[in-house]
């Protein structure tokens, strides 16, 4: 009887230890959201990294963003491109956020773009563009017995586009700005607009 109890205790102890080990492994494991050649975008716990796998299996990392618990990047892409003889990588993903009350709902979709130079492990440009769909209930009388639903869209920020020349174009419905890469400073700068033409 004593031997049986001892075996049960040992079995329970081993099971608990195995379970804890598995949990620890899961907590430190990463999830891959996008990959391009030796570059991958991965989530470790709540931190979103760009991993660069070098020869000899050594990995470099660039921290892209820290997320709130239970939040994840969506539709992630990695796009390498050449500018001024240097290869840069554009990482793009989406984030969703919803604010809701009894009379109003705001569903926001944010597109985040970060451009990195891998050699120096530098983020050379960050951009966010948000489109928010707003749904509101408006009452047409004081007693709030008759109502109508109004939908509208709010756009904020600029779309981030990389053209064939390796230049960044930030555009929305109202304006368009071009940026070029300055290798010495490791950053994109706006192209100065020339003087406006005078009417004759």
Give, region by region, the residue ranges found by the protein language model.
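Bacterial Sec-dependent N-terminal signal peptides
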Residues: 1-26
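Exposed acidic/polar residues on beta-strands and adjacent loops within beta-sheet cores, strongest
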Residues: 20-200
